[in-house]
Amino acid sequence: MYFGLSEEQTFFQDNVKKFLDDQAPLDVIRQITAEKNTSIQEEIRQGLTNLGLNALLLPEEYGGLGLDLLFAAAVSEGLGSGVAPIAFSGSYVMAPLAIIHGGSDAQKENYLTKIASNTVKFGIGLSEYIGAREDAKLIINGNKVNGKALFVIDADDASHFILSDDQGTMFIVDADDSGLEVIELTSVDKTRSYVEILLNNVTAEILDNTVKNNNAIEKTIDAGRIMLAADSVGAAQVMIDKSVEYAKERKQFGRVIGSFQAVKHMCAEMTAELEPCYAIVWHAAHCFDYIPEEARLLACQSKSHISEVTKMVAKKSTEVHGGMGFTDLLGLHYWFKRIGMNRQLLGSPELVRDEAGKIQGF
């Protein structure tokens, strides 16, 4: 039985990659990360939403394309390969799914149509449910929320945020609320935005079907983890390709370094370890929609395993490049940092493996 991306999924992924090659080459990524040039980021985001990235998972009745998570995983892989400096996993995957699975009919009609028309953009922060840190605690009292949310993703130009408490209740807050303060967090990955949000008596719209029901938030987190895994696979593949290309050109001791057995073995090991990761993340994405009883475990396994494999690829790829691997001239560090940040978002490999063990009754 053949299991892989369909012709349509590959075509869409190729279009995303081509757009990024044309509109967001490495020099543009450098400019964005060095100058925090949001105008260029907005142009890139607008171009990708013109391709339909904002509407991938939205049901057709709300103006979306009605596609499945495997389609989104193919897109995420393409975005990772280009270290795309835009919001995707949070804004256009997790947020729509949170509303689809946790919102009332009225909330779906209100927000999903606006996501489809690109008139609202969500940042999302669920760290309180995944594993609260320090004093980052959100307390809901009626329709008011107080506290602090850490590691909110896709916050650039967000008009709204979806947050949660430690019980899994998700709620929407307006980014313009006078009691809400957004503090940008320092991160090694400058291609995306990570913030801390302070809330002081902020008005919250609770997603109706998430009260005393963890199904919606768990599905939202599962989807996010699969997207991050796919993004890392795309980034790691680029690092391997660059390593092989460099090994064929770089000469040392009168011969190309790719002729040395040690370098050959590093490239072969990276490829052998990464290749199965495609099937792992594709299967997890497929199960999300079609075998839901297995989806949560597979999301944990794909996120944890791929985080480890891509970390190894990032390390060995840098070693193949030698000292040049650390320079900005080649820009390898953008993919390195992307992989490193994906590894920690929505749960480290250790935390996610612990969740997988609990799911299996260990």
Segments and roles (model prediction):
Residues 1-82, 102-107, 114-119, 219-362:
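Alpha-helical interface subdomain recognition
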Residues 82-92, 206-207:
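Short, flexible active-site-proximal loops enriched in glycine and acidic residues
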Residues 87-106:
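N-terminal glycine-rich flavin-associated loop
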Residues 100-103, 163-166, 172-175, 198-200, ...:
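Short beta-strand-to-turn element immediately C-terminal to the catalytic PLP-Schiff-base lysine
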Residues 117-129:
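A short, Trp-centered hydrophobic/proline-enriched beta-strand micro-motif
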Residues 125, 148-180:
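A short core secondary-structure module
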Residues 133-136, 151-152, 175-209:
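Flexible, small-/acidic-enriched active-site or ligand-binding loops
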